Amino acid sequence: MGSAYGSAAAIVAIMLVPVVSVVQGQEEARAVAGGGISVPGWAGKIDANEASRGQKLENAKLAKEGNALHVTTGPAVAYWNPANKATGNYTVKATFTEPKYMNLNDHPHPYGVFIAGNDMGTDQQSYLYCAAYGKGNFIVRGFGPAAFQMNGRGGEMNDAVHKAAGPGQPVTQEIALSVKGDNVECAINGKTVASYPKADLVTSGKLKSTDGIYGIRFGHNTEATVTGLTMTKQ
């Protein structure tokens, strides 16, 4: 009897392991006090999976502080000014400063720039983004309109990506996305960390074009400032 009970308990324990992991992995996005967009001319849209859980754009915050944009999330979100458009060959870059690494979460979350935005603000919006984490890795992902990944679920580690000294410490990343002929590249802190053929991006289920609106992208429960958001023609 004891042996049978032990076997049954072991089976139950094994069955529960993935369930517990899934529950622990579901970190809910917070609602930021005084949220919304207060920067004239700017717009935003949260991810569809965030909206399906009852989140709204007003639960994240985009504000202007001097020459910087100050973002606090909230649900994962993209922000843009519709006047910011890029066509042909170009580079979009910005500098992101997380003043207190992981101050709103117990693990790192990413932020970066996006390009090739089309149908922005609608359920059919598409764009590509490159984003960095303060632990030394980066991701290249997009929406077309369903989410897609270019370098895997966890992204890639790269020495070019700055690492915070620890929780509560500052970390800064300069992130750029470039369209150069038949390729699209992501550079972080001056080093190219990823390059993809344009044909692998402008295709069914991904981008409509590499021409389009550019802006900034933040994961949920993250806070950082953005400076020097610029587009340069190649």
Language model features: what each stretch is:
Residues M1-A10:
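Bacterial N-terminal signal peptides that target proteins for export
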